[in-house]
């Protein structure tokens, strides 16, 4: 594709050089540039792409899109724009043939519930006979193809290229998680969504966003800008959780017809006569397409909201109630979301991705409703991330758990012991007994807490003290199979660790 064709979609401020030059690829990482490539000099939080123009040129870049004309290279084609990220989004969509124009696209955003909702929407699509590709926190997948996801929502070039590949391989729909970072950085600005779904908004990512209003503002763009009906997709919808206070605001400002969902009597999609049990969720589903009983094997009130979100998305796509019911009642299993780990001791071991205060409380509420024995919770808080949620999560765990074991969770460049010290400030004032980890090897009676820097040791301790009827919750990492210490990533999987820990404690090691 010629550079002049790409330039037409970005309204450049200034251009220099031969715009008839052929472009063979788009890149925002100078290390990945290949011959004939167009490089985007993006300004980031920790680095500035303008500093890497020379490196990109050495690797074969023939042109650059930039914001700072004073950094423009001599003897190289360049295009100056006001927003390089927006330009990259538009150019990427054009370069890869506008892959979202011809298939239904469902975008799901919110603090919690995105991943489970994508799995449920995928199941509904499958029931309708529509093979759907899914892009999210766990993986990018379609059919037998599965690629681990480096980001919830990739940069716009990778996103458009991935969707192009999946559509070419036969995907007839796309279901994707849309992160606040992606919305803030315009990664999805050139995706044409048929349905935008809002799950909820609670504290998270305040290391990146200034405050909750900024966080909400990023999420809101999907509903106030990106789902507006247009000539390509004149019928679009916004599925919004109106029980959430931020969702209630979106209901009033969305630019597409709203399908509200929740438990309130005036929600367009709602559940009535709901019963929660160890077997799942049962009740009556009320939709604009009719009313019907339903049952799902998913557990807890928070998963009821995920189910309603998926139902609202199905309504937005115009799918029948029978199809929607068939999807949500199927065997939907989400890795690292209240995922059970088998053992021979009669202990219920659950691995969950809950890494925010709200998510942890939702999971622990569900666990406490199902528990017949004690609840032992192992969790930590990530380094180089929002520090404000650390004591909040500790207080929540202390409130619901009989024993809280605070440990590490991707400490990154922070000192693990320092993170744990901050976490403990939320549980120490509760007056619970503080155990030495070594004394817990003999078991415990009083409600309390302890800490271990090693997550491996923390999981082993939980396995040692648990008895039949107890529930052990390993929270924070879920599907992740790594631990980030410093700047290095090491293999670590809570599920594997739990299996080994219970096997070891069974044998008396």
Swiss-Prot record:
<dbReference type="GO" id="GO:0009252">
    <property type="term" value="P:peptidoglycan biosynthetic process"/>
</dbReference>
<dbReference type="InterPro" id="IPR035911">
    <property type="entry name" value="MurE/MurF_N"/>
</dbReference>
<dbReference type="GO" id="GO:0008765">
    <property type="term" value="F:UDP-N-acetylmuramoylalanyl-D-glutamate-2,6-diaminopimelate ligase activity"/>
</dbReference>
<keyword id="KW-0436">Ligase</keyword>
<keyword id="KW-0132">Cell division</keyword>
<dbReference type="GO" id="GO:0005524">
    <property type="term" value="F:ATP binding"/>
</dbReference>
<feature type="binding site">
    <location>
        <position position="187"/>
    </location>
    <ligand>
        <name>UDP-N-acetyl-alpha-D-muramoyl-L-alanyl-D-glutamate</name>
    </ligand>
</feature>
<dbReference type="GO" id="GO:0000287">
    <property type="term" value="F:magnesium ion binding"/>
</dbReference>
<feature type="binding site">
    <location>
        <position position="30"/>
    </location>
    <ligand>
        <name>UDP-N-acetyl-alpha-D-muramoyl-L-alanyl-D-glutamate</name>
    </ligand>
</feature>
<keyword id="KW-0547">Nucleotide-binding</keyword>
<dbReference type="Pfam" id="PF08245">
    <property type="entry name" value="Mur_ligase_M"/>
</dbReference>
<dbReference type="InterPro" id="IPR036565">
    <property type="entry name" value="Mur-like_cat_sf"/>
</dbReference>
<keyword id="KW-0067">ATP-binding</keyword>
<dbReference type="GO" id="GO:0071555">
    <property type="term" value="P:cell wall organization"/>
</dbReference>
<dbReference type="GO" id="GO:0051301">
    <property type="term" value="P:cell division"/>
</dbReference>
<dbReference type="Pfam" id="PF02875">
    <property type="entry name" value="Mur_ligase_C"/>
</dbReference>
<keyword id="KW-0963">Cytoplasm</keyword>
<feature type="binding site">
    <location>
        <begin position="110"/>
        <end position="116"/>
    </location>
    <ligand>
        <name>ATP</name>
    </ligand>
</feature>
<dbReference type="InterPro" id="IPR000713">
    <property type="entry name" value="Mur_ligase_N"/>
</dbReference>
<dbReference type="InterPro" id="IPR036615">
    <property type="entry name" value="Mur_ligase_C_dom_sf"/>
</dbReference>
<keyword id="KW-0573">Peptidoglycan synthesis</keyword>
<feature type="binding site">
    <location>
        <position position="385"/>
    </location>
    <ligand>
        <name>meso-2,6-diaminopimelate</name>
    </ligand>
</feature>
<feature type="modified residue" description="N6-carboxylysine">
    <location>
        <position position="219"/>
    </location>
</feature>
<feature type="binding site">
    <location>
        <begin position="152"/>
        <end position="153"/>
    </location>
    <ligand>
        <name>UDP-N-acetyl-alpha-D-muramoyl-L-alanyl-D-glutamate</name>
    </ligand>
</feature>
<keyword id="KW-0961">Cell wall biogenesis/degradation</keyword>
<dbReference type="InterPro" id="IPR005761">
    <property type="entry name" value="UDP-N-AcMur-Glu-dNH2Pim_ligase"/>
</dbReference>
<feature type="binding site">
    <location>
        <position position="179"/>
    </location>
    <ligand>
        <name>UDP-N-acetyl-alpha-D-muramoyl-L-alanyl-D-glutamate</name>
    </ligand>
</feature>
<comment type="similarity">
    <text>Belongs to the MurCDEF family. MurE subfamily.</text>
</comment>
<feature type="short sequence motif" description="Meso-diaminopimelate recognition motif">
    <location>
        <begin position="409"/>
        <end position="412"/>
    </location>
</feature>
<dbReference type="GO" id="GO:0008360">
    <property type="term" value="P:regulation of cell shape"/>
</dbReference>
<dbReference type="Pfam" id="PF01225">
    <property type="entry name" value="Mur_ligase"/>
</dbReference>
<comment type="function">
    <text>Catalyzes the addition of meso-diaminopimelic acid to the nucleotide precursor UDP-N-acetylmuramoyl-L-alanyl-D-glutamate (UMAG) in the biosynthesis of bacterial cell-wall peptidoglycan.</text>
</comment>
<keyword id="KW-0133">Cell shape</keyword>
<keyword id="KW-0131">Cell cycle</keyword>
<feature type="binding site">
    <location>
        <position position="185"/>
    </location>
    <ligand>
        <name>UDP-N-acetyl-alpha-D-muramoyl-L-alanyl-D-glutamate</name>
    </ligand>
</feature>
<protein>
    <recommendedName>
        <fullName>UDP-N-acetylmuramoyl-L-alanyl-D-glutamate--2,6-diaminopimelate ligase</fullName>
        <ecNumber>6.3.2.13</ecNumber>
    </recommendedName>
</protein>
<dbReference type="GO" id="GO:0005737">
    <property type="term" value="C:cytoplasm"/>
</dbReference>
<feature type="binding site">
    <location>
        <position position="476"/>
    </location>
    <ligand>
        <name>meso-2,6-diaminopimelate</name>
    </ligand>
</feature>
<dbReference type="InterPro" id="IPR013221">
    <property type="entry name" value="Mur_ligase_cen"/>
</dbReference>
<comment type="pathway">
    <text>Cell wall biogenesis; peptidoglycan biosynthesis.</text>
</comment>
<dbReference type="InterPro" id="IPR004101">
    <property type="entry name" value="Mur_ligase_C"/>
</dbReference>
<feature type="binding site">
    <location>
        <begin position="409"/>
        <end position="412"/>
    </location>
    <ligand>
        <name>meso-2,6-diaminopimelate</name>
    </ligand>
</feature>
